[in-house]
Amino acid sequence: MFIYKWPADKKNDTGIVSQHSSCNVHGGGISSYADNPSGAGQSLVECLDQALRDVPKDRHTGTPLYLGATAGMRLLNLTRPEAAANVLAAVTRTLTQYPFHFRGARILSGQDEGVFGWVTANYLLEKFIKYGWVGQWFQPRKGTLGAMDLGGASTQITFETASPAEDPANEVQLRLYGQHYRVYTHSFLCYGRDQVLQRLLAGALQTHGPHPCWPRGYSAQVQLQDVYDSPCTAAQGPLTFNSSASISLSGSSEPALCRSLVSQLFNFSSCHFSQCSFNGVFQPPVTGSFIAFSAFFYTVDFLRTVMGLPVATLQQLEVATTTLCSQTWSELQARAPGERAHLPNYCAGATFMHQLLSRGYGFDERAFSGVTFQNKAGDTAVGWALGYMLNLTNLIPADPPGLRKGTDFSSWVVLLLLFAAVLLAALVLLLRQARSAKSPGAI
């Protein structure tokens, strides 16, 4: 949950929205409550209670409240639309019990998720419009940033492009602050970090051997129902299996075999356009600078801070991934004892990220040098949520803002003239005092 704030008298302004606070909902996403819809609403109560404290009481009824659901709910809606509707109805009942101005809960499309993340990044980093010292807004000379988001069930890539997309489904045209933007965007469902980990787990089970991406010395009981319960992994499962059965699986710390297992997630052979990323999806060449956030950031941050490895180039990222995937379970625990629950999967996540960027999206060394891994801009998280809120509340106008922030130019001129007059008067007074001190009659 994110709470944003902005001055009430600057509603059509920009550069003024900031994140007031946030709250992490415990447990899984709302899609995990498909068989217990009421639990989805109950899971939000703790954060909603925090919102009651964080938002001033006299602003409760005037504060808009939105819920946007992403890839997890898109998957549920594909396979069990009735269950998805029940979950949304349950969270709606909970949200309407609070004094905020609830304005709806909906499932975002993959295109929406990608574009809203792109809007958030460029809004926060002032790529659309900047505020000058003389009280005027101006268009920055530099271009926009591309955005890459790696969520739990999907991953998105979005960037501005000069040429029309060969596949109209991958193009969005926006008009912001009087400027036109042609944006390429695509969301890959089942390529979010959580679903990738499940697909790799299913792939490891098919080999009847150890999991090459897990560290040697680590083992876990794997519930088959948990592995094959997703539409992303259903095709990898046996035709019949005991849903209550479990299998003991161990890791082997084999970087080369892990890379091979990850490569099976991508299809590079089919493309009906002039060029594709993977799975037959059109993508123009990546251009300009990019910001990579969410699980992209957390993976790189682990490699940098916990493993102490450089990742400034694609080659360094590959070497760092190989080093990580060669670690044993005891070695990893010694490095990060507080992250025991996440440690087994960092190798798989890093290997997938490297292949997605280099082979999937086509980043070479030159293009990769323009990628920044960042999860916040100031105190505000980078992600789709802020862009979604800005769109729903019309805080980004299509035309340039008519309002000026702070003191306008004419006021600056008057202040400068007054300052000059005071300074001149002070100089005249000092000169007179100096002359008086030098006169014969002076004491």
What label would you give each PLM region?
Residues 8-19:
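Beta-propeller domains
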Residues 3, 22-60, 66, 72-147, ...:
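Helical "lid/coupling" subdomains associated with nucleotide-phosphate turnover
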Residues 151:
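Active-site glycine-centered loops adjacent to acidic/histidine catalytic or metal-binding residues
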